[in-house]
Amino acid sequence: MVEEKKKKDKESKYAYKKKSAWEVFTKDQIKKAFDFCEGYKKFLDTAKTEREAITYINEKIKKTGCKIFINRDKEAAVVVPGEKPVAEGVRIVISHIDSPRLDLKQIPLYEDTNSNVALFETHYYGGIKKFHWVVTPLALHGIVVKKDGSKIVFNLGEHPGDPVFSVPDLLPHLSYKVQDVKKLDEAITGESLDIIVGSKPAKGDFSEKIKTALLDKLYKEYGTSEEDFISAELEAVPAYKARDMGFDRSLIGAYGQDDRACTYTSLRAIMDIKKPRYTAIAFFVDKEEIGSEGNTTAQVTTFLRSIIKKLDPHVDVDNVMLKSKVISADVNSAVTPNYTDVFELKNASTLGYGVVMSKFTGHGGKYSANDASAEYVAEIRTLLNKNKIPWQAAELGKVDNGGGGTVAKYFSRLGMEVIDLGPPVMSMHSPYEIASKVDIYSAYLAYKAFLES
């Protein structure tokens, strides 16, 4: 009977079976992964907005001697010259530095006389589940640009002793008719995602005493008037710190791992390469979460073209791009317990099995997708296997079950070879996403191997 069972458990030597990173990595590599993620957690706590990410990247690169190009404080490219001339193409790893959040409206402050609190009006950014954002401790990050052009930097709610902010919710005793019987995506509306910012009234004969007190406080502490909010970019983000998760500390829970997991790993990768064969570029772009619209995004090719011309004024930029190869460094969804029926499990990614290679994204019949060529998929697969980097192949959910996109399609339109490659993340687009330390480290190794290839 035992012999018979052994025979049944055997698989063809030609069968594909993805391997756990915990089994592929040596004990020393697992230790390196854990050590690597200590820096990653600090990055997540430091860079919760796109501007903060660029500031962090710039400060790190200044110490290395690498070239860095910055566009409007929201987009950057780090360059390491290669042995081959730029005319023969470049190697690019591109990630996005924005994450879903609550943005303040241009005229945000108001006083609610029924509840006697003051609030900021918000407009959510990116694809969120609105119910995630109520009763979540929030910090306020961003800048206010005054009429004289001077900038005031906000970062309130992150440090010990700082106040935090929150979107209030209704108690379950009274929520039945207005929330409980509604669809999940209708119970909390976008207009209700206003954050409480104060309740102490000013002394004196004012029509809105709480609002008046807060405007006075903001002017005294920051020198801002209400009109200054019109030229501000203020973002309410989760005040949570990145933390180890699980008894074994194998996971990381944090806000913004989509896509700062790829931002940090690609930054570290380009900082750690010495003399690549081809010129290596780590690209960091904004506004991917809202379709890459704007002048600091992957859709705008002017910045990339200007960089190529600065590297070599004599090249034909279009020809360089035709010869270039790209990794679109973005996360994929990890199979989620209790919701496995939305995934086609043979073609889904799981935590702890390494970096995820996605040949295509999009939705339905592969609409709005970059579909990487079989030749390029084979090239990346060979690179990962050669360097013994744990990886898995996956797409986002079952066919016709939804879908998503990345910046891959924008760079492929320039004639480049592009494929999506990034770590799996659970609870994506929530205020507290989950990733595996070995997957984060696998992404770093993959980007480093690619940039050196």
Language-model features: locations:
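N-terminal hydrophobic/helix-forming segments and targeting peptides
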Residues: M1-S453
